From Swiss-Prot:
Residue numbers spanned by region Mitochondrial targeting sequence: 68-117
Entry PTM: A fraction may be phosphorylated in insect cells and HepG2 cells, a human hepatoblastoma cell line. Phosphorylated in vitro by host protein kinase C or mitogen-activated protein kinase. N-acetylated in insect cells.
GO biological-process terms attached to the record: DNA-templated transcription; symbiont-mediated activation of host NF-kappaB cascade; symbiont-mediated arrest of host cell cycle during G2/M transition; viral genome replication
Species this protein is from: Hepatitis B virus genotype C subtype ayw (isolate Australia/AustRC/1992) (HBV-C)
Functional note: Multifunctional protein that plays a role in silencing host antiviral defenses and promoting viral transcription. Does not seem to be essential for HBV infection. May be directly involved in development of cirrhosis and liver cancer (hepatocellular carcinoma). Most of cytosolic activities involve modulation of cytosolic calcium. The effect on apoptosis is controversial depending on the cell types in which the studies have been conducted. May induce apoptosis by localizing in mitochondria and causing loss of mitochondrial membrane potential.
Name this polypeptide is given: Protein X
Amino acid sequence: MAARLCCQLDPTRDVLCLRPVGAESRGRPVSGPLGDLPSPSASPVPTIDRAHLSLRGLPVCAFSSAGPCALRFTSARRMETTVNTHMILPKVLHKRTLGLPAMSTIDLEAYFKDCLFKDWEELGEEIRLKVFVLGGCRHKLVCSPAPCNFFTSA
């Protein structure tokens, strides 16, 4: 099941909002170690202290010590992969899953940011609104009662 995220830059706060879109974002909230999770059926994932991370609104496995299990992060409008380009993300994530040296969580976060902002700047999109599909992952999105999950650009 793919999770759809709506990404929108909020220039007043200089943050990128990631909002769940569609049926994947609905469900009964359940309290967990990472906050409210949309479904109790999502399998548990080893976690790390993510207080220093600014990336929000991604599946629980994005903050796992084993790394995220999703291998696709694509633009739904063009259906082209944005983060699998020069750094070969699936290989990086596979190495992290095996416990081998790979890109750190902080570097992975910066990589997501760079790809998103680079696409927007190079394409000259004024609205800066895209829907992304995060696929290949059985984990649900991390949901919070706040109106928007943020990942900051600072």
